[in-house]
UniProtKB/Swiss-Prot annotation:
Known EC number: 3.1.26.5
Molecular function GO labels: ribonuclease P activity
Cell compartment(s), UniProt: Cytoplasm
Protein name per its UniProtKB record: Ribonuclease P protein component 2
Primary location class: cytoplasm
Coiled coil stretches, renumbered: none
GO terms for biological process, alphabetical: tRNA 5'-leader removal
Signal peptide range in chain numbering: none
Transmembrane intervals: none
Subunit structure: Consists of a catalytic RNA component and at least 4-5 protein subunits.
Swiss-Prot/TrEMBL keywords: Cytoplasm, Endonuclease, Hydrolase, Nuclease, tRNA processing
Known role: Part of ribonuclease P, a protein complex that generates mature tRNA molecules by cleaving their 5'-ends.
Length: 118
């Protein structure tokens, strides 16, 4: 028996955030994933993180840019949490938000194309 899919009106509304890491140090994909999760937990707490549903999508170590997904209602909360992240494993950093979009395709075209994303 095949399960029915939810209609679009009942699905979670997501937004995608493009970010850039400004640092002299290099970061791996796993470090960035942990960084996003820990920054969210530190600022929003467990309940806020559960409601924001941050989800790491992609990271390019060459340009130090990436994409993270979150719930539409908590975009500003997650941006604030990322902004407050200043160090990770002894490495100093700044996370700059490049922009927010409803689709990954538009996010890449509008905010990440200048960094070589296609």
């Amino acid at each position: 028996m095949k399960l029915k899919t939810l209609p679009p009106t009942l699905r979670d509304k997501n937004r995608y955030i493009a970010f850039e890491i400004i640092s002299d140090d290099e970061f791996t994909k796993d470090e960035v994933k942990s960084l996003i999760w820990e920054a969210s937990l530190r600022v929003l707490g467990e309940l806020g993180t559960a409601l924001a549903k941050p989800w790491f999508i992609k990271y390019d170590p060459k340009t130090k840019t990436g994409i993270v997904r979150c719930d539409r209602e908590y975009v500003e909360h997650l941006r604030f949490a990322l902004m407050l992240a200043t160090d990770f494993n002894g490495k100093r950093l700044i996370i700059r938000t490049l922009g927010v979009s409803g689709t990954i395709k538009r996010l890449k075209k509008k905010f990440l194309s200048q960094y070589g994303w296609k």
